[in-house]
């Protein structure tokens, strides 16, 4: 099966849809990375997806290496999830009242992550981190939060400073509209630098409510924590009476049955979850020690609420996803990530392109760099201008990678031999495009 067999022949319909969208939606998209700003070209408007395959409005099919930015570990339109969603929708879409399924999902999640004793369901990862930070401040009576450069915790004003994900993709230091007052109690430190954390606690320890960190960052590209880093954060926060918030929105229930906690079991005070836990529908959660969580209303004074929180259709999708994700699914995820990493490394090595392919379980990234990437500064110093030609060569061959050098690559358990043949066929051309790129290749 040659790469020309899968060449994308036309994107005319996607281009028209993007023009139409730009007339009614700012930038034509509802999340900035989707606009292809970092790579240029026409965003693909997807009309359907099954297994590991996406189909766009022009009928082009792509092997999916984004998986809706992480959630689709089973692949798209998995029968068990579709059946659960259909059954739930038949019984009503939203009630504004408690439902049995939200309790079932909460219990399923609590059973997988030992430090989580209570869980509150919300509608997005942003809501989860925002609420966790508010709760940490309410519980400790302190105001300051430490976050790390390159870690992204949703578009919460106080946490956008020097963030990853779309903020990194667009090259923004923060965002207009975030006031000095909103960010005044946020301390931003370099990632993987424990000495900076210790020094900051020595200076401000009595004012620090919490440290928030991605369990294993994936929003500046995949940049795993150094050995013992999260455990050291646990130790220093405990020493100073601050809370540790571990953001598992991306890693939770993806990199293992218990998320990053299953790989690096650090007993944080609070965790945030999203993506996989709702099976591709809008839902998220935060949870942790009962003593902390029971400060939430209606038991305590820290307020948090949401009209659609615990939505029965989203709960059904999440519960079906977690129950279908057995040991075989996680073995397939790991094997597929291994296979993809080998193909990437082989093609880039053959083309003479310096590269790093860091891993966080079955998540990975491609950095065009001679040296390992251990923090946001190193990620930004990589030769990211090589990424756009690399990306477009893959996309034109019917492979759908992340559209930014600063995003993670995700596999599903449904990624099959046909998809891998397509990826293997496309990579040599893509690697040569990266090799021939210059700084002027930026879109």
Swiss-Prot record:
SUPFAM superfamilies, A to Z: PLP-dependent transferases
Keywords per UniProt: Cytoplasm, Isomerase, Porphyrin biosynthesis, Pyridoxal phosphate
Modification type N6-(pyridoxal phosphate)lysine: residues: 275
Gene3D superfamilies: Aspartate Aminotransferase, domain 1, Type I PLP-dependent aspartate aminotransferase-like (Major domain)
Disulfide bond as UniProt keyword: no
One cellular-component annotation, GO: cytoplasm
GO BP of this protein: protoporphyrinogen IX biosynthetic process
Reactions listed under catalytic activity: (S)-4-amino-5-oxopentanoate = 5-aminolevulinate
Locations listed in the record: Cytoplasm
Pathway entry: Porphyrin-containing compound metabolism; protoporphyrin-IX biosynthesis; 5-aminolevulinate from L-glutamyl-tRNA(Glu): step 2/2
Needed co-factor(s): pyridoxal 5'-phosphate
EC number(s) reported in the record: 5.4.3.8
Annotated PANTHER family: GLUTAMATE-1-SEMIALDEHYDE 2,1-AMINOMUTASE, GLUTAMATE-1-SEMIALDEHYDE 2,1-AMINOMUTASE 1, CHLOROPLASTIC-RELATED
Name used for this protein in its record: Glutamate-1-semialdehyde 2,1-aminomutase
Species the sequence originates in: Mycobacterium marinum (strain ATCC BAA-535 / M)
Gene name linked to the record: hemL
